[in-house]
């Protein structure tokens, strides 16, 4: 069994090691109203990292269903305390799209399958959604105490597997920086805007994101929005999955 978190605790922002990575902060603009939109489902094969309805996200006022989050909500993050959601989006995938595009099938993570009784309930994620893994093996094998691993690279047995679905809605949200948030008891990522992930959006949707985050229109701006942790490849992740 892969144990995603040996410590199994929520780290307080005051004790976070904020010096280990100096992430540039995008200055908040005035466009903080909710932006909920249906995204392009089939522009590129890579799947945008997303949650699914029913996932509970830890916020400043307790757990909130991800589908109820709106821009302006305050969410608990691992590194930077409680942060404000700047953007939310959704991608609806019906059964026809799912049938002809198996790479879009959600990954089911069974309750307790990741060690320490985590996640707290059955959790479904998009294949590319990255989960935080922090245990002795990550430190020994990769010289990193904490790493991110795509859900599709955690597949093993019946506990973590790709499932057939008649359709789903993929939901995601974004902060001023890439954050790690608490979802059904496990730490996983917020939306990370990269060249690849932004290709999953139509022109109008990208324009709305760029209105909130104008720096992301340039390659340098996207590069400055760095990932919160190192991401393991499929081969690297296989070393952690029994």
Q: Residue spans of the language-model regions?
A:
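Sequence-level preference for short, compositionally simple segments enriched
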Residues: 1-51, 59, 64, 163-242
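Long beta-strand-rich cores associated with HINT superfamily self-processing modules
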Residues: 52-59, 76-205
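Structural motif
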Residues: 67-74
